Swiss-Prot record:
Its main location: cytoplasm. Coiled coil: none annotated. Belongs to the class-I aminoacyl-tRNA synthetase family. Glutamate--tRNA ligase type 1 subfamily. Gene3D superfamilies: 1.10.10.350, HUPs (3.40.50.620). It catalyses: tRNA(Glu) + L-glutamate + ATP = L-glutamyl-tRNA(Glu) + AMP + diphosphate. It holds the Pfam family Anticodon_2. This is Glutamate--tRNA ligase. The lineage of its organism: Bacteria, Pseudomonadati, Pseudomonadota, Betaproteobacteria, Burkholderiales. The gene is gltX. Keywords: Aminoacyl-tRNA synthetase, ATP-binding, Cytoplasm, Ligase, Nucleotide-binding, Protein biosynthesis. CDD domains: GluRS_core.
Amino acid sequence: MTARTPIRTRFAPSPTGYLHVGGARTALFSWAYARHFGGTFVLRIEDTDLERSTPEAVQAIIEGMEWLGLHHDEGPFYQMQRMDRYREVIAQMLAAGTAYYCYSSSEEVEAMRERQRAAGEKPRYDGTWRPEAGKTLPAIPADRKPVVRFRNPMEGDVTWLDVVKGQITISNRELDDLVIARQDGTPTYNFCVAVDDSDMKITHVIRGDDHVNNTPRQINILKALGAELPHYGHLPMILGADGAKLSKRHGAVSVMDYPAQGYLPEAMLNYLARLGWSHGDDEVFSMEQFTEWFDLDHLTKSPAQFDPEKLDWINNHYIKQADNTRLAGLIKPMMENLGAQFDNAPDLPAVIGLMKERVKTLNELAVTAMLFYRQPAPDAALLTQHLTDAVKPALAQYVEQLKTVAWGKDALSAALKEVLATHKLKMPQLAMPLRLIITGQLQTPSIDAVVELFGREVVLARIANYL
């Protein structure tokens, strides 16, 4: 592989469930590496596990990728649609002697492994049907279909320079002759992956370190095919805040749980980018910056820790930066589910502009914004406490001011201060009952901003109920 070889990366999930956080990070790093070099990002669906693969899982993976904006350049390619190609390669390997038929039954193989375990040996296929010079093979059993095994080298080592973990060496004696086609002819995982990586000219395989043990097997198959080897990089796992492997008990692990919980895709991408990669002290950056900066040299070897509070902080940053009209489109359906009344109500983007500074999620923003979209129901005891006889004359004067004041925050603020000065009141003495009357709540943004957004007609009507 030369410096001029076009970079080709791939994301190759098995559709046996949702797109999880670890898979999304793998996809992001593979996508970013291709983008950094102007290369090609391939999406491949490894669906040969017929018992566990489902169309629903395929759709969930594609939806997760689309939500994150990780658009593939080629694919999606489905392994189940490449069966003719796999059969062709298996036939070539059988003809070349790099694969062979094995007629050992599953019961015989299991008994073989039990004997090896009892002897303290590593369980492995013993090569009964492996052709060797001068070796006489057993008679072929009647009515038994064979599997096809890869003829793994018996001597030497498999060594590769992992871009994350450094040099890794596995002795071929640790590897047995892998089944590459089952009795029904369907090819197996490691074989399909090797053929696909070769056919698709993948130059860099970035994946989780749970695949490290697959790598020497795939390398040996690729060598047997005379294929060029890709570079491999195995990412350490993602841990929960407690140091255990990230799982459902830590909260959401499916990527598509996050939009439902009110996270923006750009926040999720930014957060995932920092799970196992760094660029100095930069915490917040755009995907354009990320793809410009991203390289494999700064991937960390130690497991990354998923910190929900850090994700909340980043999400808050992006909510504050986001266009209010876009946010309105995202939270309006949530608010409708909460019973929001939008007729004769304040402009939602304007409300969002007032409320979004401190919220961590869109769900929180939707709940907070409901202040402006439901009928107030102030607590009677709080009204008695705050709407006192001493305050009512000031409230009446404020109403008169509201009837004629120029409707804007500055003018409303000046009018309120004039009333306070006239009646020798402090701001909370009038602002608290106003908040209760107008919104039903004691905690709101500044009363001037609240009054401005509700508008003259609504504010006067609500105050009139209490004078």
